[in-house]
């Protein structure tokens, strides 16, 4: 039976942005399953479900866990950005054969609010009560933080696909010190599977300096790879293929051993 890669998108996203990676890994014989986080299956131009605003990381993780358990054998969990944090949470629940964390958001205990991150969310966090409302970056913030290596045409096409995101989840990631439930907490001692952590040196929303600390959190099982010519959008920015190829090479020995 082919190994399964369970792909978890990040903030504002959907299964659509895994198209490149699906093509690569299905071509290598993997079964790829792309998750859709709760309340993200919507028209980007539509009105978001009001329940989205108060949806917790733990709600996302619960929904994903149900999907993963239906797969049978433990999958490779591949997460991008916030999806990378959700993969870590699921990994600590013993649900993964391996974790592939692409420019991942960091769990609690790692201070990630660098100046570039604050700028990336400026229009969101300057609105009182953002933690209980659906939210979305402005086009300028998305370009600055994630899409700056894309062409102008690609930036617009990508941004036009972005849906609203949970203000609650954003709060739990960025302001974990004030989250009484500790939604973004991950017990690294429970992550025992191999972990690949990928950073982009030009990333402004999950800076490489922060992603390195994520890798160190799992130092007994992790491999860290930083790409000098990449930023946050490693799923589709120029030369995305070299990232996918590196991931495939890292996974190959695990696949052979299975």
Task: Enumerate the language-model features and the residues they cover.
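Conserved acidic catalytic loop of the alpha/beta-hydrolase fold
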Residues: 59-75
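Short beta-strand/loop motif that positions the catalytic acidic residue
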Residues: 191, 197-199, 203
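Conserved alpha/beta-hydrolase "acid-adjacent" motif
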Residues: 204-210
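Gly/Ala-rich beta-loop-alpha elbow adjacent to hydrolase catalytic centers
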Residues: 78-83, 87
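Flexible "cap/lid" loop of the alpha/beta hydrolase fold
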Residues: 95-132, 169-178
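Active-site glycine-rich loops that stabilize anionic/oxyanionic intermediates
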Residues: 10-13, 81, 201
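Catalytic active-site module of serine/aspartate enzymes centered on a nucleophile-bearing elbow/loop
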Residues: 221-258
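Conserved alpha/beta-hydrolase
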Residues: 26-48
């Amino acid at each position: 039976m082919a190994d399964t890669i369970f792909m978890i998108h990040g903030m504002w996203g959907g299964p659509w942005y895994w198209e490149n990676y699906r093509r690569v890994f299905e071509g290598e014989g993997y079964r790829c399953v792309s998750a859709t986080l709760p309340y993200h299956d919507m028209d980007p131009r539509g009105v978001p479900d009001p329940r989205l605003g108060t949806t917790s990381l733990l709600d996302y993780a619960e929904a994903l866990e149900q999907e993963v358990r239906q797969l049978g054998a433990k999958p490779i969990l591949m997460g991008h950005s916030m999806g990378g944090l959700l993969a870590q949470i699921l990994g600590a629940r013993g649900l993964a054969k391996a974790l592939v964390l692409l420019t991942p958001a960091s769990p609690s205990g790692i201070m990630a609010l660098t100046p570039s991150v604050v700028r990336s969310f400026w229009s969101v966090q300057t609105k009182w009560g953002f933690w209980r409302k659906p939210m979305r970056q402005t086009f300028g913030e998305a370009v600055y933080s994630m899409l700056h290596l894309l062409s102008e045409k690609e930036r617009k096409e990508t941004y036009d696909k972005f849906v609203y995101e949970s203000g609650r989840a954003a709060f739990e990631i960025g302001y974990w010190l004030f989250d009484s439930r500790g939604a973004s907490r991950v017990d690294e001692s429970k992550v025992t599977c191999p972990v690949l952590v990928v950073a982009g040196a030009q990333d402004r929303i999950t800076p490489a300096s922060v992603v390195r600390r994520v890798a160190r959190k799992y130092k007994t099982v992790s491999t860290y790879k930083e790409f000098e010519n990449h930023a946050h959008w490693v799923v589709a920015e120029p030369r995305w293929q070299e990232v996918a190829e590196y991931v495939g090479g890292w996974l190959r020995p695990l696949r052979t051993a299975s």
